[in-house]
């Protein structure tokens, strides 16, 4: 086979978005080595432009038919395009939030960008991984870069502690997940492509075997750790509290998107004849995540820990769409994931901005902030209320679509739990807003008293202010434009043969 024929057979055009991010990563390293600090002022815009270019190329591939790439190792279907877009969008917003934070910490901005882009590459590859080798390599790429990002503030003891905890728990969860995949590798007779593994296991009559059950349990546990679902969530609040806030912002959405993409592809492909079983397992995970995440969040005094437990509950909400297992379920998961990016990153952006001025993330220290910076309080309130699902904000319509799809699929108890815990979440979100808008001067915290008001000007927007504006606009406008977003999500599911085959199989098993 000639070289050009080999390149053509690999269908590398499907990996062009990842290629752009890789070239961007190397380019940033070369610029830093060549110019050092002389280009620090405009270094921020290089990854932003590169990531936006990658997003444009990615969107142009949406709805394509020839999706397999790299000899079947990568699946560039519309489902993977959606999740890869989410990861790129998360990275763009996090870069906007990080510049001032990293500069204040007197650490290298280039190192932060390189580690973040490496995590982006790992997450994007994981979203389309189609065989065991690609799953392992992309999982470790995402994991290792995330551990390094968590410990990025080398002189901060809390950051170091968070990195060690994340490393140990992440390594354990990866081992558990890989052990489950290795069982399937053995049952299939040595196949590595996930569709071939499923076919071989069914042909050999091992789809209901004890080993398949064990593999399902191990894979479920591994995925539960990756998306911070209860009861495998213990690492999340500690890591969220100790890590640099821009890193936490990315982990809360980017890693969750990659984990959900992996869960959707593995569960619908590898366990088509254990659908009822994995549905039951994930119903338990979703219920525990929504209940424990929201109940424990009530008692938190740290803003980052509160959002950490909130992230656990959000994983439970997202699982409702996965469990529904029909086009509306999958599309509701995609819609809510997109909305969650804006809501959650908007909240973290406000925490970063306040922390830069006040140097604290304790909820009580936000007391009276409305008197000093009413616009920041407004943006923070919009993000929190949207996370709580208050109409007419985007979070309300996202949860409504999720609950409707779950109800239509017959998961009534799960929907009731989601509704009940959403009310609980509104309570602790409103508690934060109440603290910020106290009007009595004597109730104002000492940190707010020292707080210097930021001048918000459209003509002189700082990157973090632009990031906050985009997130708040997303949280508001996405509620107005929710119908077009739902239509795009439904088309994404329609263009993904994997999800269509899964639905047909579920109907066959039901009847």
Curated annotation (Swiss-Prot):
Superkingdom per UniProt: Eukaryota
Annotated EC: 7.1.1.-
A GO-annotated cellular component: chloroplast thylakoid membrane
Stored InterPro entries: NADH-Q_OxRdtase_suN/2, ND/Mrp_TM, Ndh2_N
GO molecular function: NADH dehydrogenase (ubiquinone) activity; quinone binding
Alphabetic keyword roster: Chloroplast, Membrane, NAD, NADP, Plastid, Plastoquinone, Quinone, Thylakoid, Translocase, Transmembrane, Transmembrane helix, Transport
GO biological process: ATP synthesis coupled electron transport; photosynthesis, light reaction
Membrane-crossing segments per the record: 15-35, 39-59, 78-98, 108-128, 132-152, 167-187, 210-230, 244-264, 278-298, 306-326, 334-354, 377-397, 410-430, 466-486
Compartments reported by the entry: Plastid, Chloroplast thylakoid membrane
Membrane topology field: Multi-pass membrane protein
Enzymatic class: translocase
Catalytic activity reported: a plastoquinone + NADH + (n+1) H(+)(in) = a plastoquinol + NAD(+) + n H(+)(out); a plastoquinone + NADPH + (n+1) H(+)(in) = a plastoquinol + NADP(+) + n H(+)(out)
Family to which the UniProt record says this protein belongs: Belongs to the complex I subunit 2 family.
Job description of the protein: NDH shuttles electrons from NAD(P)H:plastoquinone, via FMN and iron-sulfur (Fe-S) centers, to quinones in the photosynthetic chain and possibly in a chloroplast respiratory chain. The immediate electron acceptor for the enzyme in this species is believed to be plastoquinone. Couples the redox reaction to proton translocation, and thus conserves the redox energy in a proton gradient.
Subunit field text: NDH is composed of at least 16 different subunits, 5 of which are encoded in the nucleus.
Record's protein name: NAD(P)H-quinone oxidoreductase subunit 2, chloroplastic
The species this protein was found in: Chlorokybus atmophyticus
Organismal lineage: Eukaryota, Viridiplantae, Streptophyta, Chlorokybophyceae, Chlorokybales
């Amino acid at each position: 086979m000639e070289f050009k024929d080999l390149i053509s057979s690999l269908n590398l055009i499907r990996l062009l978005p990842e290629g752009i991010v890789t070239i961007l990563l190397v380019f940033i390293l070369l610029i830093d080595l060549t110019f050092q600090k002389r280009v620090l002022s405009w270094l921020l815009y290089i990854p932003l432009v590169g990531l936006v270019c990658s997003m444009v190329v990615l969107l142009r591939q949406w709805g394509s038919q020839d999706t397999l790439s790299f000899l079947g190792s990568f699946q560039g279907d519309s489902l993977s395009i959606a999740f890869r877009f989410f990861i790129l969008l998360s990275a763009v917003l996090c870069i906007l939030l990080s510049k001032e934070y990293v500069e204040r910490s007197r650490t290298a901005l280039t190192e932060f960008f390189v580690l973040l882009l490496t995590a982006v590459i790992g997450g994007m590859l994981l979203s389309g991984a189609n065989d065991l080798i690609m799953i392992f390599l992309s999982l470790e790429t995402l994991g290792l870069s995330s551990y390094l990002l968590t410990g990025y503030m080398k002189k901060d003891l809390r950051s170091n502690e968070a990195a060690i905890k994340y490393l140990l728990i992440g390594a354990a969860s990866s081992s558990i997940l890989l052990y489950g995949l290795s069982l399937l590798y053995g049952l299939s007779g040595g196949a590595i492509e996930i569709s071939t593994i499923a076919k071989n296991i069914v042909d050999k009559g091992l789809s209901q075997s004890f080993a398949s059950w064990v593999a399902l349990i191990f894979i479920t546990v591994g995925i539960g750790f990756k998306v911070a679902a209860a009861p495998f969530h213990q690492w999340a609040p500690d890591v969220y509290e100790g890590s640099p806030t821009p890193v936490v912002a990315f982990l809360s959405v980017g890693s969750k998107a990659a984990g959900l993409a992996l869960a959707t592809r593995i569960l619908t492909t590898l366990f088509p004849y254990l659908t009822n079983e994995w549905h039951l397992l994930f119903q338990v995970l979703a219920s525990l995540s929504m209940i424990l995440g929201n109940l424990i969040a009530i008692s938190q005094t740290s803003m980052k820990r509160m959002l950490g437990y909130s992230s656990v509950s959000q994983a439970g909400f997202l699982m409702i769409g996965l469990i529904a297992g029909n086009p509306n379920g999958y599309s509701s998961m995609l819609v809510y994931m997109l909305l969650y990016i804006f809501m959650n990153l908007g909240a973290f952006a406000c925490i970063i901005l306040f922390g830069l001025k006040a140097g604290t993330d304790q909820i009580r220290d936000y007391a009276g902030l409305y008197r000093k910076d009413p616009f920041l309080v407004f943006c923070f309130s919009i993000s929190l209320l949207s996370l709580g699902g208050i109409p007419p904000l985007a979070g309300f319509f996202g949860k409504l679509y999720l609950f409707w799809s779950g109800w239509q699929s017959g998961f009534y108890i799960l929907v009731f739990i989601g509704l009940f815990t959403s009310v609980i979440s509104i309570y602790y979100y409103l508690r934060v807003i109440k603290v910020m808008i106290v009007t009595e001067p004597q109730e104002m915290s000492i940190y707010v008293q020292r707080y210097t008001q930021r001048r918000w000007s459209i003509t002189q927007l700082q990157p973090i202010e632009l990031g906050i504006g985009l997130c708040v606009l997303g949280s508001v406008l996405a509620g107005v434009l929710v119908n077009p977003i739902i239509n795009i999500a439904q088309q994404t599911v329609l263009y993904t043969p994997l999800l269509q085959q899964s639905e047909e199989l579920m109907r066959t098993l039901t009847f």
